[in-house]
Amino acid sequence: MKVKNNIFLSLLLIISCEVIAYEFRPLNEVIVKAEDPKIFIYVTERCSGLFLYMNNVTKNKEGDGERAQTYEQQYIINSMRAAQMRISFNKANIEEAKRETAKATKDYFENYKTNAGLAKKIDGKTFSEVLDSDHSFCQYLNKELSIDE
């Protein structure tokens, strides 16, 4: 019975990790339909969550204060942009848009935090491949949209 429980728990863990990995693919692998506003909002809120996470990682490190401020600015700009898109595309009022964007950003922040924690446990790396990939993607996107680093 104990062996069956262990096998069941192991399978459940594997399945849940695969579901998380599937749902939290790198942004550069997300299929983008240029006319789908939901994708624009999703990507912008993911970038906002990423920059919030990066701000939290860097703000307490010696010599990283300026970089932490940059991440904080990018987080704020992406959050504002996502809320504006929610107002434009979803016809949300400003309070609803801010609330939904804040919740989504917090959820993505937690996903990045969990993802980085798993990477540290698995191979000792500070950042996961998803986090590294998304960081490059979001930095590129922000440069294209004239958000300076």
Please report, for each region that a protein language model flagged, where it lies by residue.
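Cleaved targeting-peptide boundary
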Residues: 20-29
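N-terminal signal peptide c-region/cleavage motif recognized by signal peptidases
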Residues: 16-18
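Sec-dependent signal peptide recognition
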Residues: 2-10
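Short N-proximal segments of mature Sec-exported proteins
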Residues: 32-91
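Compact alpha-helical subdomains of small soluble proteins
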Residues: 74-149
